């Protein structure tokens, strides 16, 4: 009886393993079909702003009406995929669904506007949008071709003290130049006036012309 019971237990384990193998085979066969049934599109190239912020739209198309969707942003570098951020949201609530310091997102129907913050020049690479239709079944998954995000490092701002020194030097130069021009102009005006007058007033006695003669009146008496 003990041997019979062992055979029955072995038979049950064998049946369970076969069932699990069939389920795994079924998922492997139909997963590519589910992936092809969900098409994900995203822009090819995006240039990040000077503050390290990049935004792009991840849009998916599927005949399956899902109410629960999961969106994941992956970064591909050297043939390796790294998860940047991910969040599951419901389609009915078209609100901000990713609350993270790195990523934010707003869903609107089958479109998701993703924004990645805090990027630097080292973060330049291919960012792939992965969409999963979680509920109701069946499960669908799709990945976009990727968005190449270029991050240009902003030029460092010059030192404010250095700018103040430059401004002070320019102001001093202009002041000295204007002072020099004024001094030269005044000296030229004084030189022009010096031959005409000495600048000292002297009272001179009146002079009589030499040609003027004095005539004495002559009276003729009449008897």
UniProtKB/Swiss-Prot annotation:
It is found in: Cell membrane. The chain crosses the membrane at residues 162-182. One of its GO terms (biological process) is negative regulation of regulatory T cell differentiation. Residues 183-223 are cytoplasmic. Residues 1-35 form the signal peptide. Homodimer; disulfide-linked. Binds to CD80/B7-1 and CD86/B7.2. Interacts with ICOSLG. Gene3D superfamilies: Immunoglobulins. Residues 36-145 form the Ig-like V-type domain. Keywords: Adaptive immunity, Cell membrane, Disulfide bond, Glycoprotein, Immunity, Immunoglobulin domain, Membrane, Phosphoprotein, Signal, Transmembrane, Transmembrane helix. Residues 134-139 are annotated as: Important for interaction with CD80 and CD86. Glycans are attached at residues 113, 145. It is a single-pass type I membrane protein. This is Cytotoxic T-lymphocyte protein 4. The modification Phosphotyrosine is found at residue 201. Pfam families: V-set. Residues 46-50, 150-155 are annotated as: Homodimerization. The keyword Acyltransferase does not apply. Its main location: membrane. N-glycosylation is important for dimerization. Phosphorylation at Tyr-201 prevents binding to the AP-2 adapter complex, blocks endocytosis, and leads to retention of CTLA4 on the cell surface. One of its GO terms (cellular component) is plasma membrane. InterPro entries: CTLA4 (IPR008096), CTLA4/CD28 (IPR040216), Ig-like_dom (IPR007110), Ig-like_dom_sf (IPR036179), Ig-like_fold (IPR013783), Ig_sub (IPR003599), Ig_V-set (IPR013106).
């Amino acid at each position: 009886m003990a041997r019979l019971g062992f055979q029955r237990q072995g038979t049950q384990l064998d049946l369970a393993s076969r069932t699990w193998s069939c389920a795994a085979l079924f998922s492997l066969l139909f997963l590519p079909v589910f992936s092809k049934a969900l098409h994900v599109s995203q822009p090819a190239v995006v240039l990040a702003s000077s503050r390290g912020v990049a935004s792009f739209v991840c849009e998916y198309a599927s005949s399956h009406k899902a109410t629960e969707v999961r969106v994941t942003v992956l970064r591909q570098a050297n043939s390796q995929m790294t998860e940047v951020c991910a969040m599951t949201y419901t389609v009915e609530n078209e609100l901000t669904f990713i609350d993270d310091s790195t990523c934010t997102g707003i869903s609107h129907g089958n479109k998701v506007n993703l924004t990645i913050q805090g990027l630097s020049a080292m973060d330049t690479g291919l960012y792939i949008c992965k969409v999963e239709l979680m509920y109701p079944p069946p499960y669908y998954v799709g990945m976009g071709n990727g968005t190449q995000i270029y991050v240009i490092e902003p030029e460092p701002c010059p030192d404010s003290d250095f700018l103040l020194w430059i401004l002070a030097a320019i102001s001093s130069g202009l002041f000295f130049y204007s002072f020099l021009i004024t001094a030269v102009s005044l000296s030229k005006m004084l030189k022009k006036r010096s031959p005409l007058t000495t600048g000292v007033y002297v009272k001179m006695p009146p002079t009589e012309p030499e040609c003027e003669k004095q005539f004495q009146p002559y009276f003729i008496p009449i008897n």
